[in-house]
Regions:
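GIY-YIG nuclease catalytic motif and its immediate N-terminal context
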Residues: 1-36, 42-52, 56, 63-66, ...
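Short arginine-rich
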Residues: 67-79
Length: 97
């Protein structure tokens, strides 16, 4: 069974990048190696993996990645810190950064 990952990395400028992959270690190395000069993380190296979630279904992973990409920085930090209560509160109140 194939496993897919949605991940968040913290960049050197303290911003976050959310991505999707089927090989987490390879993808994080690619971000840090800076192979694509047009990538968001290219000028923000090094990056640090701060969150990931595994999926067995590729479509669920893609939906979750799109959802997280639309979140505020505060929501991303809530999930990174495993603070589901805060995430729920931020979602309910639609608080912005």
């Amino acid at each position: 069974m194939k496993i897919y990952y949605v991940y968040i990395v913290k960049c050197s400028d303290n911003s976050y990048y959310t991505g999707f992959t089927n090989d987490l270690e390879r993808r994080i190395n690619e971000h840090n190696d800076g192979l694509n000069s047009e990538s968001y993380t290219y000028t923000r190296k090094p990056v640090e993996l701060v969150f990931y979630h595994e999926f067995n279904d590729v479509n669920q992973a893609i939906r979750f990645e799109k959802q997280v990409k639309g979140w505020s920085k505060k929501k991303k930090e809530a999930i990174i810190n495993d603070n589901w209560d805060l995430l729920q509160l931020l979602s309910k109140n639609r608080m912005k950064d």
